[in-house]
Amino acid sequence: MENSYSVSLDRRNLLKHAGAAGLSIAAGSFMAAGLAEAQFNPPLRGRFAPGGSYILGQPGYRIPDQVDLGGGFMQRLEFYDRNERPFVMSDYRGKVTLVQFWHTNCHGCQAEVPALDKLAGRLEGSKFELLPIALSMDSQADIDRFYQRKGIKHLEVMRDRTSFVFSALAPRHPRLDAQATPTTILVGPDGNALGAYVGVAGWDQPDGVALLNHYIARA
């Protein structure tokens, strides 16, 4: 649904907020599905079909735990649980992980977060993790109210307190050329990016579930 995208941070604000590194990490790390289909051979149908909004990870691109901001300064890509404990993506190695960047005022997130909650109830286990990460505009209380209103039962509460993780990792929409929410990134058990979708993907629908199960079966 093209009208479900919520453009969260424009290029100027990203540069001010995260520095040039925030725009460069994901650049070139994802590619159109048609270019990589033969290398990965996943079931790409419906919204995940070549030529659409689903983009595959470049072979060997591992989601980083930190980025180089220049001058020898490394910035950790940390997000936090409700107890303010920091996490990085390598903490989820060993599982297929579906990361969702979202916020409570995002139009598309109103439907996708509850759908992913139900999906987590169906698929989460020793080989699969669903990881929602809310952006900095939401407080803990905002997320709790959203979860209560939407009846969220299975998803953890994670926050990207400065939206730096989002700005560093989220790809730009292949046609709109902007970062937006919701964005989902599918990560393999080795930490490599398998693919990403900017917008409401429909991971809970048959085509999305088939793609997830393809990787879960190989984890």
Positions of predicted regions on the chain:
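A short beta-strand-turn-helix
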Residues: 77-96
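Conserved redox-active cysteine motifs that mediate thiol-disulfide chemistry
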Residues: 101-115
